[in-house]
Amino acid sequence: MHDKILILDFGSQVTQLIARRVREAHVYCEIHPNDVSDDFVREFAPKAVILSGSHASTYEDHQLRAPQAVWDLGVPVLGICYGMQTMAVQLGGKVEWSDHREFGYAEMRAHGHTRLLDDIEDFTTAEGHGMLKVWMSHGDKVAELPPGFALMASTPSCPIAGMADEARGYYAVQFHPEVTHTVKGRQIIERFVLQIAGAKPDWIMKNHIEEAVAKIREQVGDEEVILGLSGGVDSSVAAALIHRAIGDQLTCVFVDHGLLRLNEGKMVLDMFEGRLHAKVVHVDASDQFLGHLAGVTDPEAKRKIIGREFVEVFQAEAKKLSKAKWLAQGTIYPDVVESGGTKTKKATTIKSHHNVGGLPETLGLKLLEPLRDLFKDEVRELGVALGLPPEMVYRHPFPGPGLGVRILGEVKREYADLLRRADAIFIEELRGTTATAQDAAAGLCGEADVGKSWYDLTSQAFAVFLPVKSVGVMGDGRTYDYVTSLRAVQTTDFMTAHWAHLPYALLGRASNRIINEVRGINRVVYDISGKPPATIEWE
């Protein structure tokens, strides 16, 4: 049985980052809404509780409080931002509006040598004070400490930026240790979880396989399972894990909608049929998908058509497998949280995710989601431990509608064929080019990145087909062909992103190869837009 950390979500947009930092310390945790019942908290039996931030104010919403059971359990509690403020209010302190709201970078002084912050610092002042570079985002502030608490940290604008009652194991910080902008944030969360809470660091993917396999076998018994295999990381790892558990009781359905990457179908079939000896039904439905997309230019309409047709094709194949009683999906933990699918109804729906609803009820199947407790990085670790090749497990994200949202405007087979080849060349150049000391000296990458491929140094890279033509010259003749844009970004969370500063030589080779090898494209441009204001995908 794993030790567990309970994260109570008060509505912060970065609560998932708290969970990721805890998991990175190899400790299991779950996110639940702040208004879970006292019985739920007691039954969860956490080693510690973390209270998240919130957009709310302690003045405006007196319902946003931690359950009383949190304070009755006798376990350590860490409050972050709003979590600090509700801790103060609930335990007898005072919170008030701040005349100097803090949003962004701040330098914070640590006080009192508490267990949480002792010896954790970014620099020391001339007076010998330990300082931390942190990220603030608050309009209220704690004005009066609760009984039993001592000052732990301060900034010029926030005299009480941290507080601690070490006898009870209660700590609170006004900054956000979960975000990368707080330089020592990961170290702070790790210290709370491992040293203060004493949680065992035994949440390791290699060991998780045995537990997951046993759970799948217990759920499924001798019944059969059907899974939609897309070639993406999540469905591939889910398929490999379920196949490890129940073998031929699993049938994978791979639908080719005509909008896959170059040779993607062959790679998936070689992997699952060839290496894993799994049962795979391959459906070429490209004519059906492309036929329904003809004349459609609106991005959202294209997404809906592709989603609708996938469901139709998958349903038709599923009905042929009359013995199947389970539908398996590659749902991962962020999907569950973002869809309001945590174990209570409080979670706010940020987006409706395709993996969390729909098909099981339509088909009358039970739902099997073996990855629903894992973050993406954990899914990748699990895939490697299951023996999937790194080039499959560490592939860049690929949208569900495939090339359909990387072809601007109407989708045609001709456009998809051109884009597939251009995209493959760009990815090949990224994989085949390693960062050099000269790249590091020019500020394109860090010194630690020298020797890594530029594919691994970018978070997502792809080509986009633009349905416009431009004049060119090839040989002695005039050309009038299509334009493609290359896009590469670097990000830690995909919520914001910077365009990747790739070496000019790499971009030049990719451009030359695309223009020379892909007949029909005579101009290549590079997208240098960040997110925001642009999104990563063009549609």
UniProtKB/Swiss-Prot annotation:
Catalytic reaction equation(s): XMP + L-glutamine + ATP + H2O = GMP + L-glutamate + AMP + diphosphate + 2 H(+)
GO CC annotations, alphabetized: cytosol
Complex and partners: Homodimer.
Location of the GMPS ATP-PPase domain: 203-395
Annotated keywords: ATP-binding, Glutamine amidotransferase, GMP biosynthesis, Ligase, Nucleotide-binding, Purine biosynthesis
Descriptive protein name: GMP synthase [glutamine-hydrolyzing]
E.C. number: 6.3.5.2
Physiological role: Catalyzes the synthesis of GMP from XMP.
Residues that, per the record, bind ATP: 230-236
HAMAP family for the chain: GMP_synthase (MF_00344)
ATP-binding recorded as keyword: yes
Domain Glutamine amidotransferase type-1, first and last residues per copy: 4-202
Pathway: Purine metabolism; GMP biosynthesis; GMP from XMP (L-Gln route): step 1/1
GO MF annotation terms: ATP binding; GMP synthase activity
Active-site residues (renumbered): 81 (nucleophile), 176, 178
Claim: Secreted is one of the keywords in the record: no
